[in-house]
Every structure is written in C-alpha cells, then in structure tokens.
C-alpha cells in the first residue's frame, strides 16, 4: 500500500472522491472519528492512513495538535478507481464470477452459488491481479477435495480467496490479516455473500496464525512475509498449500526452500511470466 506513489490531486468527482491523510504515529483503530464521511483507518507499522469521502483537514490537524506522537506527513486526493488501479469490471476466475462494487451498494439480487460480490472498500486490491486469479484457479482444480475441509487464508485483504474457498466447498475458512481494516472488509463481504457460517476473519500475523489446524493453507502475500511463513513451525506441519504473490526470482527462492523442507510442487501457474503461484503438497 503506497499512497505516496499516487498523484496528490487528481480532480475526482465529488461522489467518487477519496481523501487520504498520511500520519507518522499510530491512531488506535477504536479511536472515534467525528466526521460523517470517515471510511477507515489503515495502520502500517508506525504510520497511519486515514480515509475519508470528503475533506477532513481541520479534524486531522486537530488530532495532530492534541496527540503529541502524531506528525502530519501528507494528504492525497484521488478517485476510488485510481486508488484501486482502475475501474474493476466483473471477471471470472476458477469458475466463479466476481462482481466488484463500491460504497456498500451491492448489485441487485443475491449472489448465486457461482457468484462473489466484492466490496474492496479502501483495502487495496479489487481482485483482478493475476496472483488472485491463479489462486482461485488452483482452488477450483481441487474440486471435490475441498468439501468438508478447513482452509486458512493468510493475508486475506478483501477476503476474496476466503470467499472463493467457501464458495468452492470448504466447510470452514479462517481469514487472517494484520490490518484490522482488511478484517472488517472481509467480514462485510462474507455477510454480503451469505458466507458468515463458513468464514471467520481475525486480526493477526500470518506466521503466528498458521499454527492453527487446517487442511489447506492459502496465502497470496508479500515475499518478505512469505519467506518467513514457509519455514515457520506451523507451516511445516501442514499437508498442502497454495502460495502466491511471488515474482520470478522470489518464486525460485521459495520453490527451493519448499523442496528442501519436503514439499512437492503439484502445480505451478504463471500466466504472465511475472507473477508465480504454487500448489504444494507434503511429500
């Protein structure tokens, strides 16, 4: 997530605007935000990003004055489409039709057994990335094997892979993300899709939560986390995993580590030759 790489002002339409405030210092997620268009609080390590649907300069500056540990860094203004990297259209992956929508207004009707309605909110990623599609494709290839299984989705983000696993037959899915905003978004998407009985979303670190029992681990996550995850005690006792979020050099390294730990590469997808996704099984 890197707002600093985006244009600071992109002339968004008033109804489609995002106002993002970058602060050094952490504002606890439970802190009340007295603003009618407050959308979310994204905490990353020692920084906070506050999202609003309209300007909140006075309120944010007030926070910085009243909390000595906060420093205002920057303010960004853009559209939802620019934040997500484009206006997402419905797409199909793993035999599922994913229909993105925004601002809590889902498409008309209820999602069918092959449908997922996805509201990314301000959590980065609308599901169209090739790693996401590859993970869904590999989940679909498991077919009947998913029935009755418990799945972990580590680094769940918007919850799409958790939703996909549940739609494809998993009995229980534990969706994990370090960011509380991602957890909240995943829970909202589970409700919209009628999957709250199957999906539990919790805040935590992938390397720690992998210790929970599961038949299958799914993780589409940054390499800096993946390299620790695949050597963690909790991962090494797992029988099967789908791993993604890896560029070519990173994928080679992870593949070598997995093989050295006794895993077999059951499948390997890289539709664009850049991003790689592995289905691995304990040998």
Question: For each of these PLM feature ranges, what is it?
Answer:
Residues 2-107:
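N-terminal auxiliary segments of SAM/dcSAM-dependent transferases
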Residues 36-41, 148, 263-268:
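A short linear hydrophobic-aromatic micro-motif
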Residues 71, 94, 112-113, 171, ...:
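A short helix-to-beta-strand connector/capping loop
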Residues 83-145:
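SAM-dependent Rossmann-like transferase core, predominantly class I methyltransferases
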Residues 126-206:
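Conserved SAM/SAH cofactor-binding pocket of Class I
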Residues 178-283:
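S-adenosylmethionine
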């Amino acid at each position: 997530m890197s707002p600093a790489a985006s244009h600071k002002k992109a002339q968004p339409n008033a109804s489609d605007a995002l106002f993002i405030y970058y602060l050094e210092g952490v504002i606890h997620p439970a802190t009340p935000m007295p603003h009618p268009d407050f959308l979310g609080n994204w905490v990353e390590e020692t920084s906070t990003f506050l999202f609003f649907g309209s300007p909140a300069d006075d309120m944010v500056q007030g926070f910085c004055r009243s909390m000595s540990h906060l420093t205002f860094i920057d303010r960004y203004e853009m559209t939802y489409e620019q934040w997500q990297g484009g206006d997402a259209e419905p797409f199909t992956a793993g035999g599922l039709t994913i229909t993105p929508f925004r601002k809590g207004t889902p498409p008309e009707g209820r999602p069918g057994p092959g449908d997922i309605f996805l509201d990314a909110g301000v959590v980065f990623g609308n599901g169209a990335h090739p790693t996401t599609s590859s993970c869904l494709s590999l989940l679909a290839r498991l077919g009947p094997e998913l029935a009755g299984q418990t799945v972990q989705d580590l680094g769940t983000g918007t919850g799409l892979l958790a939703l996909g696993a549940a739609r494809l037959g998993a009995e229980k899915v534990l969706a994990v993300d370090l960011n509380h905003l991602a957890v909240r978004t995943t829970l909202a998407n589970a409700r919209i899709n009628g999957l709250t009985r199957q999906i539990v979303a919790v805040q935590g670190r992938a390397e720690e939560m992998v210790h929970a029992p599961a038949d299958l681990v799914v993780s589409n996550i940054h390499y800096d986390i993946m390299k620790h995850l695949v050597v963690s005690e909790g991962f090494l006792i797992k029988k099967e995993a789908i791993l993604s979020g890896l560029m070519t050099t990173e994928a080679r390294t992870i593949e070598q580590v997995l093989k050295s730990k006794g895993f077999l590469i059951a499948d390997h997808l890289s539709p664009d030759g850049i991003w790689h996704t592995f289905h691995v099984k304990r040998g």
